[in-house]
């Protein structure tokens, strides 16, 4: 067959498209993936028929599906569909714009060649689904003034050339094409007063008046035609005008030009509606964004942009030499990478800013650009000739997620993790051994070495926990010195009070965290006996609700203990009407139980309680459970840590209403929930000085999202300042966007880049032992620290300490006397709209 890679990828696209056709044929409304796959696949087939042109196929593609054939969210998710195929005259790009213009599509065309039955249009009826608009922006009504309080002038400009001339917003106007004739003296130190990145076009022979404003910042002109190089002052103005005359640049004096200050004189003032501003640069202060297809709205609390001086990359845009990009700054004085105009959602706030990256670290969040011509540029956020740009307009940025409950059962889970937005994995294991399938322990020093070596080139941060189950502390030292950054106590190894005390004693000695899965059997005692064994020492309790394991039925009480850092795992996030039914078989497999042994079945059933799972929802919403993690392949889904966190937040908003009285946004709830998978697991595990938030000095582990896909599918994952994974189309295509668009590894994930931009977390003892050199690790190796004196009060926005009781017979949970109960959700967001299976 001699199939090329692009042909193999198109076969995957065809499989998805044919699956979509089968679903359409049985009367199902298609989701985002199905819709794109079907349209792209049919275009490929029509091209193969050889009878249609590109233009004809662009029209046909719009006819295939109507609004009734797709889920209500789909028209807001699919902007266009692009695919490249082999026509009679070679490979060509087909782009389908303006989809879903009609109520119904041409289903005969949509199913042409599939030999599937064409369903009646009567099957596609409207129902009472929630018609949320994914990623919608709600703007305030007032307009914004661009370039406010600046000197401005109106000048008459004539194009005396025979070709059109287009001038960008930040081009120094005195430097423009010599065939534009105007008063260049009055234009000295000025630029167009238009939206950043826009341009004004002068057709041949055209005369028009333009408004110019003074440049900002240090007022230094660089670049262009080198007419007026240097600071704006009288001496340089005279030299510039001499060059204008000498070099034959068009110049005519305009004596009565109108001058004034923007914002004071309406004729000199440029305004823009908030809707148009949001379309160009993303929402600004006071505007709101819907997160995915949830009912959560994030309101921008602060925007660092200077209206009119936004940094925008592209042809004729702002970030060009002497304009948004400074001239003459050496590499050490400028950013390596800037993410422009991004909405940042972090526990610290919801802001709009540029993000500066240098040497793999976040340098700052604020205003980036060229301080020679722009106001309020941060001194450490200069864009220079050595700066790469990632356009963040219209995107949301979060810190890379931290999953601190990972069973390392197979290496493939790493790729599901990173493509979902996780950049740090903490847990234990050795592969699909039965011990790892049940517990997050890497027991032997040689196995610790194996895990650190095997993950060395993977583009994530890793930390591995040793087995902590030993009543005699002498056995625990070696695994810590071998590289364990924490210890795990698990009931499958015997989490007795003696083992707990021994493990915590050793952890105190080495300043490492202890993660505990308590005794479901109540074999050595009840939950109060385990709490007593803690002796007030810091401990991180895994799946604190209990379905994942722990004292039955009341392990959830630990969420009210000051020395306990509670987390829960995602299979019970949130409580839905199918949650209970899936859990029994899940548990039997994970913990090596036998369905033919009654005691094994009783053990499993004792852990699955609707009442405590429902209470878990509410305790998360109250901030009493501080962390959400996966429990990967051991009763949890590593690729759904983020989505299930936001599903829980959405469910709680719908059932409990606003968290703060009178709020007209969901900012507090959003910050509380994002903290559960970013900063709080970082703090709990001693990593927060390196990762866990979008703050200066931390590793640039960042996740970029389209608002409409927030929480479901990231657009890009940046690891240590470099793009590690991103949505990327056909690698052979003329542009990067034709189907199949897949979350693919990028250069930041290959070769030595995967290790050079990531960290292996170990104990200080292991670092001092020299494990980096002795194991031959390429990754940066850092020691965890500052975990032994942590309390619940250190958990950001999730530090509530309720008094919790659980009725041992009815399993009713109360917190400070309030019965915690909620109904199971029948539907959740971030699900059917986005995923093929």
From Swiss-Prot:
Disulphide bond pairs: none
Pfam families: Amidohydro_1, Urease_alpha, Urease_beta, Urease_gamma, Urease_linker
HAMAP family: Urease_alpha
Misc. remarks from the entry: Plants with decreased expression of EU4 exhibit increased susceptibility to the fungal pathogen Phakopsora pachyrhizi.
Active site, UniProt feature: 591 (proton donor)
Catalytic function, reaction form: urea + 2 H2O + H(+) = hydrogencarbonate + 2 NH4(+)
Organism: Glycine max (Soybean)
Pathway given in the UniProt record: Nitrogen metabolism; urea degradation; CO(2) and NH(3) from urea (urease route): step 1/1
Residues binding Ni(2+) 1, per UniProt: 405, 407, 488, 631
Gene expressing this chain: EU4
Protein name in the entry: Urease
Induction details: Induced by the fungal pathogen Phakopsora pachyrhizi 1 hour after pathogen inoculation, followed by a strong down-regulation at 24 hours and another up-regulation peak at 192 hours.
GO cellular component: urease complex
Leader peptide range in chain numbering: none
Coiled-coil residues: none
Family per record: Belongs to the metallo-dependent hydrolases superfamily. Urease alpha subunit family.
Residues bearing PTM N6-carboxylysine: 488
Assembly and binders: Homohexamer. Other oligomeric forms may exist depending on pH and presence of salts.
Cofactor(s) demanded: Ni(2+)
Biological processes per GO annotation: urea catabolic process
SUPFAM superfamilies in UniProt: Composite domain of metallo-dependent hydrolases, Metallo-dependent hydrolases, Urease, beta-subunit, Urease, gamma-subunit
